[in-house]
């Protein structure tokens, strides 16, 4: 057999497999997904597979299988293992001699990530119809399948029968895509694949290829022997309704935020600076992975930093007036935020080329922020050189403005549906930080960010350049108020009140009825943040066997080798009693139990040593003090600063001052005194944690204190004597010893003076900062003497701490035993004292701290950071779940009050989330005297130090369960239990649960998320229970009738005829998915699928209505045609229900109650936008999502059935396009020029616009027969600009007729045989559909004229024998040839164009003869030349004559009387609206600056037409693909013609297909179809603070010409507007810009123009122009201010065949050219002279004379022909 020896041993064991020859074939059509059938007659989901004829790509004869088969059976094709003959060759011998490793055999593409023996490696499929003609020894598969699995043609494969069909079903399938893909499209794609087989690497499509994706992996959860489901990768699988689809975008908008802070410029442990890790490590690897995956992201890279300023520096800034952007944080520190955009919205093929520029900008950033910014301001103010100095200091990583950066990126995404880019999907935010993933943040900003992230369905990636810390990450710490006592809540009428623990993140003291509140430190583990650790050292490749230290002692590590007097180090012997003597070998479970027991003894809030019958000392309440003072908490509580007090005070002073301390603190100090300890105020400088001691600066001990170190053992002995029951049989590190630290000793009568007492370990280390005791009952004011520049160790995200300044009296109880310190005593006692330095972030518990000062450390802010705002929330705070937070000082209270020790029951974990406690101890280790109640577990009793768990199950239901389960989770980051971690993942991450089938490891980089961000999953399993829904939600119900109005357009007619209710339900689900809803399904791991999940009962109106969830989600319900579909999104839950008896759909909605403040956060800072030359001021508003009325779903549902047709109340997608001249020559092609016609460039521009409109007319939605059809899109041609054309009454009447419709003929006549006179008579009848009016064109006025398009349309609508456009054109040409009509200038034959005007020839125009005598047949607009107006005046160049873009507002006297426009309508004699030769200019001057007539209203003029487009006329999609088109009506071909498309959840690829078609057609005629922003570029900073238009100033202001208006009128320049004439000329005549939108104030003041695609009240501050390439937009500010420039990001960042680099460079070159010209005063002066019109000549004839002369000459040339009865 070819390819090796065939091993058929496996094939003979049973009859469930067979060997067949495999043949490949190439399918004619891709059967995968919906693309198998290009036309979808129905939008209803098909069954997974018909039992009779399931779809299959495998062709096989049933006779080839040795068992009975039927359609739908599951089979698998596998390769047969072939053993290759082991014949040694010369090459293998040489290879073995050289010691080279054999090359790894490359596996087939579908099997690359499938572990051999641990996943399915074959191709599974469902058996289709029998193929009796196929060979019984063959099986045929598509060639793509054979390539993916390595099947070779004409080789045997093994075909297996699969008995367990469930084992072939895929649980998860991940797709990659590179286009804009809506969530509804994802859902439809998944449903279209149900019942089909997919394999890894397969490409699937929907809607005829409009939606395309590729399978990345297939996973199925398989249960192991212990019953735990473990995900395993499959090479293929069958899609079912239960399959969860994961979509990752390779074309997203990516934001890379790189944090600049103190650590950025420092070295890590491996000798590499963190800034180098970014530019030489992380970014190159990221870009390489992007290239490998073929991504096409649009990338923005931003550097962000926060600079702190001391008080003296603030005074310096105030002195020089530089405090504009100065702010204060919650701790009272002064700071400024800096953001610099390094790369802005760029798409590149090779991102490696950007690294040098990024590196240069990073290297310059330190000087730019700390010096250059203020230096530029000082130089501008003329400051002396000696006054210039560097001010500010980098913040540490944990103090960074990371939330501000995230919110700034979210601001433009708030309206992601506006200016929709049709080539990308999703937003990825990545923050690269040298920290460890912990950030100290403001509570309100954290809450706001959480709400916004959940609302958008997004996540953020933190990439930390350090090694993973020993605490949980990501971690946000904040300060919050909390109630001191339990909050009572009535569970029902007459029910017993229960205590409630509020979620502190959502607790606002000023909105609560609770008055007795305090401050507390909280730690939150955000579910919307994913953390990766890029701790790669490039000169030390990663090795699995390399030991990596996780915890280092900085002070000892930094001691030199000579300092280590190792000979004096003596390790005490172990006590025999301390050695455990197990009676049997310990199992793994035993060891784990011992470790957990040990950890519980450390982290439990109550001592486990208090037993029944113990001594009063044993049973005394645990007086637990906080581990140290939190700098942030102190800042919140500090009310005043007082003078410092001496560290050594008389004992009486200590006792006297104990009343000013909190009860716990006072008790602790009293305990220390009574035990003979010297009570020393704790240093505010943080200390290393016993769990994670970080590096600190070297400090020395004073000789006095070092001599006291010897007393440690004496203190230990005394403690042993005082508390024998506690310390008996204790051993170093044992649970008993550790638990002793949480069972403090009650106060005893004082027996010695302070000075005589032996020193406790608290005195054995120096105090590196002085502490000032404040008499304030609420706080102490702490001041540290700090160096100007703190030194930091590697890997620090927070400041480093001093060494532990307190040790346990017994060596085994301290982190550093006395024998270690004694060994360093010579060194420490001789070194100089050092100052306090900021401590690195440590994680420790406050509620397990001992009574002395052996406590973990916390970040210690600088001097300026410790001045905080006075506490407004009441007395002093108590710490809560506070790793690495200091305990606030307590309010005045007696130092000790006995209390009863109560026992805590084992608690149960729940899905609700409260501020997490430290893990409660097991029941067996808790006191047995009594049961600890909920209050005791939730709050620490004042003065008693009892640990209070915030996980009480009876309180969880009262907490805002949904709020936390979808947003917020507090946690003890030092010791989170496995169950807690699961709760965190399941709570806030429930919306993202089905994105990660496998649990990821945080110590690795999450490359899949960084390469291709995942979209929000389509399904979730979160649903609140009845109690939660009653307490947390408001509910309501409405119904949607299942019938369709005539105006509906969201349901296809064929689907409505098949099953209207089903079609409406599917569309309602589809629209909600597009708005970020998720379908709620049964939990994936539900062990009893047949058991219904409890639903919120209050929604059940009828007992016989099924409301249970289904595992298959919406697809399963739609197939059944009955039941309910549950959906959720952020704050909303909807249930859509088929009514069992009525033709209607019942919608139950639930909206979360908002009980917290929702005020917006105002931010200000300094930004350096791309293209600018320095930092500039910026501000932004961070707003909460609007929960109550963000989307009107009632309106949306009734829009589906046609009861409503307005999009306004909804969140709909929109994008704007403009049609502009491209400046290129038209593409020559057959049919471009009509025969015997010579069209100029302007004529081709008009023709191109007409062709575009005709194409759009073919996309108009065809309504069902018997209903009115939509009118065709038309253009009313003009050569005026928008602000001028509104003064042309005839034009405005034509506009109104087009918008509101016009009458058409009755089509009862026949044209054949009719005389010319009869045709002329019909043409002149009023209201017959043919508009004959006076028209302005190119400075001339044509009376009694009509255009060719209107005549052709009139012939079609009037005569029954004129059918079709071609027939009408033939008849119109015949009328022209027979002398009935002619072109107004006799330069063209008949062409049905909108811009070519015709008139009746004499004598057929007798009905208008009186008008011709009165108005004149052809009038010059201003008749400035005696030769008439057949051509422009000689003084007007061709460019000037053709450029009506160059106009300006008239300079009118405000006091001039206002002239109202003539509002007469059609139907009157045309002479009634006659205007004299200069009427437009005169009217404009009168009304432009005037006010509307008193008592009157502005005249509203609608300028747009609205139509419904069918984007899928060929029915490729399975649903109605419609969009609303808004288009201009009046158009000047030299200006931009505007389109705006609005839609609700359509397949974007069909929109892109239409755009490409219109773009290609436009280019043929010298036009360009360009996508542009909806709003003006001047408003860009309102949405995005770090983007702004670039100002381009004029070096020379335009000259002031008093008679400029007269000169412009003399050259027939519009209405003679003179304002900004020179600026407009620069743009249009010099640099090829085209007028896009005119400024609002250029329109007459008594006219209000209305555009249906603009919001009411939206005004354009300045006129906006677009470059003919579409790459740039410019607004004209005027004067020396010049212009505002902005690249058109929608064009610059769009994908192109040639790449995007050339577009970016081209846009920059255009801007550079304009900047250079505007900065050259000499060139400007010369240009002003060139474009200035000459003054009018004195010998000109008057307008009347000129017109009479012209008319006489024209009459001589045109003699009326005798009227004849010519028949047609």
UniProtKB/Swiss-Prot annotation:
SMART domains attached to this UniProt entry: DEP
Signal sequence extent: none
Pfam families cross-referenced by the UniProt entry: DEP, IML1
Biased composition (Low complexity): 688-703, 756-779, 879-894
A Gene Ontology term for the protein's cellular component: GATOR1 complex
InterPro entries: DEP_dom, IML1, IML1_N, WH-like_DNA-bd_sf, WH_DNA-bd_sf
Renumbered residue ranges of the record's region Disordered: 86-105, 637-816, 847-934, 1419-1439, 1457-1476, 1729-1768
Protein keywords: Membrane, Vacuole
Membrane topology annotation: Peripheral membrane protein
Record field: compositional bias (Acidic residues): 1742-1759
Domain DEP: 1326-1402
Feature: compositional bias, Polar residues: 655-670, 704-732, 902-914
GO MF: GTPase activator activity
GO biological process terms held by the UniProt record: intracellular signal transduction; negative regulation of TORC1 signaling; positive regulation of autophagy
Localization per Swiss-Prot or TrEMBL: Vacuole membrane
Family to which the UniProt record says this protein belongs: Belongs to the IML1 family.
Protein name as it appears in the record: Vacuolar membrane-associated protein IML1
Name of the gene encoding the protein in the UniProt record: IML1
């Amino acid at each position: 057999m070819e390819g090796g020896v065939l091993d058929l041993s496996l094939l003979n064991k049973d009859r469930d497999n067979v060997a067949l020859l495999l043949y490949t074939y190439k399918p004619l059509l891709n059967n995968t997904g919906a693309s198998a059938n290009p036309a979808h007659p129905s939008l209803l989901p098909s069954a997974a597979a018909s039992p009779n004829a399931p779809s299959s790509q495998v062709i096989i004869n049933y006779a080839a299988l040795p068992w009975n088969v039927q359609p739908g059976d599951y089979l698998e094709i596998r390769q047969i293992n072939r053993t290759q003959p082991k014949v040694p060759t010369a090459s293998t011998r040489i290879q073995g001699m050289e010691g080279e490793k054999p090359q790894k055999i490359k596996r087939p593409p579908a099997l690359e990530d499938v572990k051999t023996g641990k996943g399915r490696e074959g191709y599974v499929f469902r058996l289709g119809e029998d193929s009796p003609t196929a060979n019984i020894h063959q099986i045929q598969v598509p060639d793509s399948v054979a390539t993916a699995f390595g099947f070779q043609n004409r080789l045997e494969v093994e075909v297996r029968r699969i008995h367990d069909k469930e084992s072939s079903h895929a649980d998860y399938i991940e797709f990659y895509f590179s286009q804009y893909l809506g969530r509804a499209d994802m859902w439809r794609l998944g449903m279209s694949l149900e019942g089909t087989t997919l394999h890894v690497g397969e490409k699937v499509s929907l809607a005829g290829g409009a939606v395309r994706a590729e399978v990345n992996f297939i996973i199925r959860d398989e249960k192991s022997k212990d019953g735990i489901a473990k995900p395993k990768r499959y090479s293929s699988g069958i899609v079912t309704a239960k399959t969860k689809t994961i979509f990752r975008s390779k074309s997203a908008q990516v934001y890379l935020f790189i944090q600049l802070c103190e650590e950025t410029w420092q070295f890590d442990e491996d000798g590499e600076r963190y800034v180098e890790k970014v530019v030489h490590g992380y970014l190159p690897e990221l870009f390489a992975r992007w290239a490998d995956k073929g991504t096409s992201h649009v990338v923005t890279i931003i550097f962000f930093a926060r600079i702190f300023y001391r008080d003296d520096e603030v005074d310096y800034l105030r002195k020089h007036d530089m405090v504009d952007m100065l702010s204060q944080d919650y701790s009272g520190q002064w700071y400024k935020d800096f953001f610099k955009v390094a790369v802005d919205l760029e798409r590149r093929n090779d991102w490696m080329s950007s690294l040098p520029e990024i590196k240069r900008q990073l290297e310059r950033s330190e000087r730019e922020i700390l010096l250059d910014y203020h230096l530029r301001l000082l130089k501008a103010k003329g400051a002396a050189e000696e006054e210039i100095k560097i001010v500010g200091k980098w913040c540490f990583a944990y103090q960074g403005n990371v939330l501000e950066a995230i919110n700034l990126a979210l601001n433009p995404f708030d309206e992601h549906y506006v200016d929709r880019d049709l080539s990308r999907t999703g937003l990825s935010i990545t923050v690269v930080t040298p920290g460890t993933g912990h950030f100290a943040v403001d509570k309100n900003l954290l809450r706001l960010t959480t709400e916004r992230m959940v609302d958008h369905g997004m996540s953020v990636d933190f990439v930390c350049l350090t090694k993973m810390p020993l605490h949980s990450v990501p971690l946000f710490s904040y300060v919050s108020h909390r109630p001191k006592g339990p909050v009572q809540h009535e569970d029902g009428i007459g029910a017993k009140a229960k205590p409630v623990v509020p979620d502190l993140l959502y607790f606002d003291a000023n909105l609560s009825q609770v008055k007795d509140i305090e401050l507390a430190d909280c730690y939150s583990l955000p579910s919307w943040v994913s953390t990766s650790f890029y701790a790669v050292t490039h000169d030390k490749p990663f090795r699995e066997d390399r030991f990596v230290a996780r915890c280092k002692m900085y002070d000892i590590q930094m001691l030199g080798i000579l300092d280590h007097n190792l000979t004096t180090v003596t390790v005490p012997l172990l006590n025999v009693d301390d050695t455990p003597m197990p009676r049997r070998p310990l199992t793994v479970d035993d060891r784990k139990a011992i470790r957990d027991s040990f950890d519980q003894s450390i982290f439990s809030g109550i001592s486990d040593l208090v037993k029944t019958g113990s001594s009063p000392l044993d049973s005394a309440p645990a007086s637990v003090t906080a581990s140290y003072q939190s700098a942030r908490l102190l800042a919140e509580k500090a009310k005043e600063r007082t003078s410092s007090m001496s560290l050594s005070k008389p004992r009486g002073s200590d006792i006297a001052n104990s009343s000013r301390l909190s009860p716990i603190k006072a008790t602790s100090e009293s305990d220390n005194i009574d035990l003979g300890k010297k009570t020393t105020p704790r240093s505010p400088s943080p200390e290393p944690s016993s769990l994670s001691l970080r590096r600190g600066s070297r400090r020395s001990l004073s000789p006095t204190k070092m001599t006291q170190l010897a007393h440690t053992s004496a203190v230990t002995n005394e403690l042993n004597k005082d508390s024998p029951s506690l310390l008996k049989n204790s051993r170093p590190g044992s649970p008993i010893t550790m638990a002793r630290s949480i069972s403090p000793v009650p106060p005893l009568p004082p027996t010695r003076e302070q000075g005589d007492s032996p020193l406790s370990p608290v005195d054995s280390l120096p105090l590196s900062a002085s502490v000032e005791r404040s008499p304030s009952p609420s706080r102490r004011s702490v001041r540290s003497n700090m160096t100007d520049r703190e030194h930091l160790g590697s890997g620090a995200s927070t400041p480093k701490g001093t060494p532990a300044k307190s040790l346990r009296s017994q060596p085994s109880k301290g982190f550093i035993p006395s024998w270690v310190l004694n060994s360093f005593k010579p060194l420490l006692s001789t070194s100089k004292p050092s100052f306090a330095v900021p401590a690195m972030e440590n994680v420790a518990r406050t509620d397990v701290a001992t009574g002395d000062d052996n406590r973990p450390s916390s970040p210690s802010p600088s001097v300026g950071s410790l001045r905080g705002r006075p506490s407004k929330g009441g007395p002093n705070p108590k710490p809560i779940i506070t790793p690495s937070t200091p305990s606030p000082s307590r309010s005045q209270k007696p130092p000790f009050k006995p209390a009863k020790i109560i026992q805590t029951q084992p608690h149960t974990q729940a899905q609700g989330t409260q501020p997490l406690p430290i893990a409660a101890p097991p029941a067996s280790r808790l006191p047995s005297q009594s049961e600890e109640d909920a209050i005791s577990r939730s709050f620490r009793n004042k003065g008693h130090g009892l640990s209070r768990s915030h996980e009480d199950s009876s309180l969880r239901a009262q907490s805002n369960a949904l709020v936390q389960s979808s947003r917020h989770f507090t946690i003890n980051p030092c010791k989170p239990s496995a169950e807690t971690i699961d709760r965190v993942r399941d709570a806030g991450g429930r919306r993202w649960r089905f994105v990660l089938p496998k649990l990821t490891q945080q110590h690795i980089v999450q490359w899949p998320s960084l390469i291709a961000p995942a979209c929000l999953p389509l399904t979730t399993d979160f649903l609140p229970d009845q109690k939660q829904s009653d307490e947390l939600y408001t509910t309501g119900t409405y119904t949607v009738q299942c019938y369709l109005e005539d105006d509906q357009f969201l349901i296809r007619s064929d689907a409505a005829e098949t099953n209207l209710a089903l079609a409406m339900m599917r569309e309602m689900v589809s629209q909600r998915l597009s708005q970020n809803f998720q379908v709620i399904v049964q939990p994936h791991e539900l062990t009893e699928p047949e058991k219904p999940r409890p639903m919120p009962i209050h929604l059940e109106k009828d007992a016989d209505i099924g409301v249970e969830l289904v595992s298959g989600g919406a697809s399963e319900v739609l197939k059944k045609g009955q039941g309910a579909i549950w959906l959720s999104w952020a704050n909303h839950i909807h249930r859509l229900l088929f009514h069992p008896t009525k033709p209607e759909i019942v919608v139950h909605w639930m909206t979360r109650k908002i009980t917290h403040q929702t005020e917006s956060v105002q931010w200000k800072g300094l930004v350096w936008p791309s293209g600018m030359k320095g930092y500039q001021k910026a501000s932004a508003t961070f707003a909460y999502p609007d929960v109550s009325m963000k989307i009107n779903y009632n309106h949306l549902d009734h829009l589906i059935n046609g009861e409503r047709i307005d999009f306004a109340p909804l969140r709909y997608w929109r994008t704007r396009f403009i049609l502009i001249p491209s400046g290129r020559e038209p593409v020559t092609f057959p049919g471009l020029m009509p025969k015997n016609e010579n069209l100029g460039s302007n004529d081709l521009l008009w023709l191109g616009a007409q062709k575009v409109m005709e194409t759009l007319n073919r996309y108009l939605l065809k309504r069902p027969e018997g209903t009115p059809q939509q009118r065709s899109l038309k253009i009313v041609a003009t050569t005026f600009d928008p602000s001028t054309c509104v003064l042309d009454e005839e034009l405005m009447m034509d506009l109104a007729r087009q918008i509101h419709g016009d009458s058409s003929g009755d089509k009862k006549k026949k044209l054949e045989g009719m005389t010319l006179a009869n045709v002329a008579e019909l043409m002149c009848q009023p209201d017959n559909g043919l508009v004959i009016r006076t028209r302005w064109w190119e400075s001339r006025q044509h009376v009694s004229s009509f255009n060719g398009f209107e005549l052709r349309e009139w012939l079609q609508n009037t005569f029954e024998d004129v059918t079709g456009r071609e027939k009408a054109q033939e008849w119109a040409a015949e009328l022209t040839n027979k002398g009935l009509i002619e072109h107004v200038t006799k330069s063209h034959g008949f062409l049905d164009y909108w811009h070519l005007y015709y008139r009746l020839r004499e004598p057929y125009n007798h009905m208008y003869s009186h008008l011709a005598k009165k108005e004149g047949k052809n009038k010059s607009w201003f008749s400035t030349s005696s030769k008439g107006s057949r051509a422009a005046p000689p003084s007007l160049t061709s460019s000037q004559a053709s450029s009506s873009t160059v106009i300006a507002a008239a300079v009118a006297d405000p006091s001039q009387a206002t002239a109202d426009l003539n509002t007469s309508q059609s139907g009157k004699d045309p002479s009634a609206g006659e205007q004299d030769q200069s009427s437009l200019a005169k009217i404009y001057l009168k009304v432009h600056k005037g006010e509307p007539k008193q008592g009157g209203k502005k005249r509203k003029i609608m300028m747009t037409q609205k139509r419904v487009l069918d984007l899928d006329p060929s029915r490729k999609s399975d649903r109605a693909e419609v969009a609303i088109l808004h288009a201009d009506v009046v158009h000047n071909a030299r200006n931009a013609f505007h389109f705006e498309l609005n839609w609700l959840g359509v397949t974007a690829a069909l929109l892109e297909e239409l755009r490409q078609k219109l773009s290609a057609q436009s280019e043929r005629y010298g036009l360009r179809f360009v996508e542009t922003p909806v709003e003006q570029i001047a408003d860009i900073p309102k949405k995005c603070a770090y983007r702004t238009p670039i100002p381009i100033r004029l070096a020379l202001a335009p000259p002031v010409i008093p008679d400029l208006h007269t000169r412009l009128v003399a050259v027939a320049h519009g209405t003679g507007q003179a304002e900004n004439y020179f600026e407009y000329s620069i743009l249009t005549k010099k640099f090829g810009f085209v007028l896009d939108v005119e400024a609002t104030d250029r329109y007459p003041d008594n006219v209000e123009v209305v555009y249906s695609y603009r919001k009411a009240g939206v005004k354009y501050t300045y006129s906006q122009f677009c470059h003919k390439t579409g790459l740039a937009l410019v607004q004209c500010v005027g004067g020396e201010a010049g212009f505002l420039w902005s690249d058109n990001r929608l064009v610059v960042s769009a994908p192109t065949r040639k790449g995007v680099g050339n577009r970016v460079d081209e846009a920059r070159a255009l801007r550079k050219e304009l900047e250079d010209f505007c900065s050259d005063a000499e060139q400007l002066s010369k240009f002003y002279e060139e474009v200035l019109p000459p003054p009018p000549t004195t010998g000109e004839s008057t307008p009347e004379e000129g017109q009479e002369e012209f008319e006489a000459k024209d009459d001589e040339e045109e003699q009326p022909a005798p009227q004849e009865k010519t028949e047609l």
